[in-house]
Every structure is written in structure tokens, then in C-alpha cells.
Amino acid sequence: MFCRASVVARLVSPAFLLIAGQAAALSFPLPPPGEDVVGEVRVIQAKYEDTFADIAKANDMGYLEMVAANPGVDPWLPGEGRNIVLPTRYILPPGPREGIVINLAEYRMYYYPKGENVVYTYPLGIGREGWGSPVTNTSIIDKIPNPAWYPPKSILEEHAAEGNPLPKVVPPGPDNPLGPFKFRLGTPGYLIHGSNKKFGIGMRVSHGCFRMLNDNVLELAKMAPVGTKVRIFSEPYKFGVSQGQLFLEAHTPLDDHGEPSVVDKHTAVLTALHNNEQITAGYQLDWNVIREVVAGEDGMPAEVSVPVSSVASTEAEMPF
């Protein structure tokens, strides 16, 4: 039987365990070519009044990734002194390390400043069921501080039908859903922006736009110029290499039509493997561990291979 605790135990070992102090923005030096993993899993102790929403905001985390990394812990009352895992180790997304990269399945953005050997990463609120965020390649076409909000017709109609009508314009200020800053994307109708709500970052809550913590969106505003490329995709299964070992990071696949079946998830893993043959070739995979990681969906990289010099995994070895 799969035990999610076994995966966490491998990750939160003495080599990786850091007791978090004051939170800082999540940024990491880029690893050298051929390396894909950044950060380390951290652990903090909850205070009496803490909730996962509080802890997530203080540590640049999203709500659902906190829940996934801490199975069995009450997110509204973790308990004073309870050890809380912060899943701050990441496999960098596949593809070019440039501009803004958003992985919807992670509820997370990665930003690679041009000419710098660093990556910043931020949690996101994304489009809820029926209002999914787009999968596309686009760019930032405008930057607007202290924006007013002009609700589109579809949102006005939705709120009116719910008996909660909106004004045609919401001025800048603490009640503005866009927060202190917005980026307009080349994909019509979509924004990256702040928020007037404490809750919702790292969840499916928006009408398709990308919500950030206000401190995060203001930090990004100082760095990302108009013209910055934005690549948006949804990949729940990321493979990457670190120190000669192959790792897999698994998240819950997004599906507007219900929970994906086990077969769907395994098919997605095989697709991710084929899409990453340039890094997975040369490794013999431990399929027992892969099954654990896929079932666990805890969002933390786990080692899934035994390195070999001449034997590559083939579909004949796959136990699905």
C-alpha cells in the first residue's frame, strides 16, 4: 500500500531539513546545465493561531500545495508546535528558462530575469472550474499600478444572477480585486494581478486571470518589463535531474470534468517521460517509487531512478 509519509520522510531528511525563520521571497540561483532541481524542503512549527492560509502567505506558498505536503493535518487548526512541511524544493519547468513560466498544475509561476543567473517563484490563484486559465504563449503588453477594475459583462451578469450586483467600475484601493498592480497579457482578457483577499492564492478561484500575493506582484512589477515572454502550460508530472539522479514531482492533474482516473494519470506520466527523453534516457526507473509519487501528489521532488550507463527504460518495463 502506498504511504505518503514514506515519500516525505525521504525528502525531509537531515540533509534537507531546515527550520524556517523569517520568510523571504523564494528565489534560487539557477543550477548548472543538466541540473533541474532548486531549493530544499523546509519545516516550521505552527503557532497556536496559525492556519495554512497564514503560513502560506508568510512563506510565499499556495494553500493547496500546503495541504498536499501535510496530509492529515487540519489546515484551519494545525495545532501549536505541530511540524509543518513547506514544499520549497522544485523541479524547474521543462522548456526555456526565460521570462515568465506558469504551470497551472502547480499553481505556480517561475520568473527568469534576463541576464541574471536566478529564478524567482511565486504561488498563483488560477481560473476555477468553468473559467479555466489559458494554455498559451504570450507576453506582457502593459503594466498598470493602482488599477481600477472594470468587470466584464460575463462577471457582471454572474454576480447579478447571484443577487450580488457589482458596480461597473471599482476604483483603486483596498476593496479592488486587482490589488495594487496588474500586468496585461497579449492574450485578450487575461491579467496577472494582486488581490484584495487573504485567501485564494494557490487555488482555483479566479475567472481565468492569475492572482498573486500583493507583495509578490509588486516585486515582480519592479523586475519584469513590458515585452517579457509568458509561457503558460499545465504539466502535473515534472521530471528533472539533480546530482546524477532522476527526480519526479507530481501534482494533482487539473480536470474540469471530474477526478482523473488512475489510467489517465499513468498515461500522463508516460507522456511526460516521452516528452523528456533528453533527460530521462540513461536511467533505469524505479516504478514502485513512481507509483507512490503519482498516487501521493504531494508536490515534492522524489528520486525515482537508479542511474545506469547503458540501459534506458522502455515501455516493456512499465508495470501499468
Kindly give the residue locations of the regions a language model identified:
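Bacterial N-terminal signal peptides that target proteins for export
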Residues: 1-12
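N-terminal signal peptide c-region/cleavage motif recognized by signal peptidases
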Residues: 20-22
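Primarily a LysM-type cell-wall glycan-binding module
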Residues: 27-60
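Intrinsically disordered, low-complexity Ser/Thr-rich linker and spacer segments
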Residues: 30-34, 88-102, 241-244
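LysM (lysin motif) carbohydrate-binding repeats in extracellular/periplasmic proteins that recognize
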Residues: 47-76, 118
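Loop/turn positions that initiate beta-strands
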Residues: 49, 79-84, 227-230
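Gly/Pro-biased beta-strand-loop elements
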Residues: 90-198, 219-222, 250-251, 256-320
